[in-house]
């Protein structure tokens, strides 16, 4: 029998310190937002895009997760397993422990996100570029406390800007890290697992180290809805967006309005229903509009 391989990892081991005023004694991923937990909303998205096996890394208040996971396994088709940290491993430290159980290319998601993205398009982008590490990026509405990337050619990350003590001086000139990644396992083989005292986020450890090794990192930039609820202000904004049905309508699974105009104000028509990665995918419109 073929061993089960996980195609998605959800990191839920954080303490959620900044949101304690709202969540109290409940871990952030389990706290209901507009009537449903962040964790369950994530699993709904993964099921919709045919993910088969999800592993959730937990640490803080782990017993609360264990009870809830049994309910979710009965409710959804995604097969959900748990990796419980004996000692805090940071956001990404568990990846080296569970590496042999991961698919060659897997999705990594921070557990405090409310999102709706088309994972099939993300996977197509990642595979077409033979990417080893793809960051899902977007225009951040809080760049001063986000990790940022410079992507002048549209896909290849040219530079990274790490926030320090939740501050980043780079502001609006660059794309923000969304907290969703697609990772090839070769990346883990090239790095030594972080020591417990050095445990950091995917961006601050994996992205930083791979960038220093001069291995190509790609940016999948999307206008789809991805927001963390790490502060009270953001939590209330996300809750309001959910109540007003603003989260799912920008998913690329649905047709979006778009207008391509070059620098000479020429309208451009995309000949194929996919990302423009080659000029052959374009054609000029002869008639006046």
Give the role of each language-model region.
Residues 2, 153-154, 264:
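Residue-level recognition of short loop/turn positions
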Residues 2-65, 280, 286:
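N-terminal glycine-rich phosphate-binding loop and ensuing alpha1 helix
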Residues 65-66, 70-153:
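Conserved beta-loop-beta/alpha segment of the NTase-like Rossmann-fold superfamily
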Residues 106-107, 114, 120-127, 140-143, ...:
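Catalytic-core segments of class I nucleotidyltransferases/pyrophosphorylases
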Residues 252-256:
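Short, small/polar residue-rich loop motifs at catalytic or cofactor-binding pockets
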Residues 257-289:
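Active-site neighborhood of HAD-like aspartate-dependent phosphohydrolases
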